[in-house]
């Protein structure tokens, strides 16, 4: 069993809800698996043609950020997150203890 029941809600009562990007099911906002992806607006095949056609030496390709939100079942199905053993669940990826310590000071 997970320590936080798969949620990031502490002392908030109720969290808002979001819709899954894949299936459309309603999921609590703190339970949803969120990923932020930066994607180029121009695909790589046409980027070379654009680079030859432009007169500028340095051409910055426009990019856009996409925030994806998935329910737990869709995130497991799409292999965004995986089922982990009870010991492996204790490992927190992307967790920086120094950042938390500086926020409390």
Swiss-Prot record:
Family recorded in the similarity comment: Belongs to the eukaryotic ribosomal protein eS26 family.
KW Ribonucleoprotein (keyword) present: yes
Naturally occurring in which organism (per UniProt): Encephalitozoon cuniculi (strain GB-M1) (Microsporidian parasite)
Entry keyword annotation includes Chaperone: no
Subcellular location: Cytoplasm
Cellular component GO terms, alphabetical: cytosolic small ribosomal subunit
GO MF, one annotated term: structural constituent of ribosome
Name of the molecule in the record: Small ribosomal subunit protein eS26
Subunit structure: Component of the small ribosomal subunit.
Gene: RPS26
Pfam families from the UniProt entry: Ribosomal_S26e
GO terms (BP aspect): translation
Lineage: Eukaryota, Fungi, Fungi incertae sedis, Microsporidia, Unikaryonidae
């Amino acid at each position: 069993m997970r320590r936080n029941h798969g949620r990031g809600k502490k002392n908030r009562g109720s969290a808002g809800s979001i819709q899954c990007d894949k299936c459309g099911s309603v999921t609590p906002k703190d339970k949803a698996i969120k990923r932020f992806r930066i994607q180029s607006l121009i695909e790589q095949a046409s980027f070379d043609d654009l680079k030859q056609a432009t007169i500028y030496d340095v051409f910055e390709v426009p990019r856009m950020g996409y925030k994806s939100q998935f329910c737990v079942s869709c995130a497991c199905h799409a292999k965004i997150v995986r089922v982990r053993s009870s010991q492996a669940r204790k490992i927190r990826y992307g967790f920086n203890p120094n950042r938390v310590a500086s926020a409390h000071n």
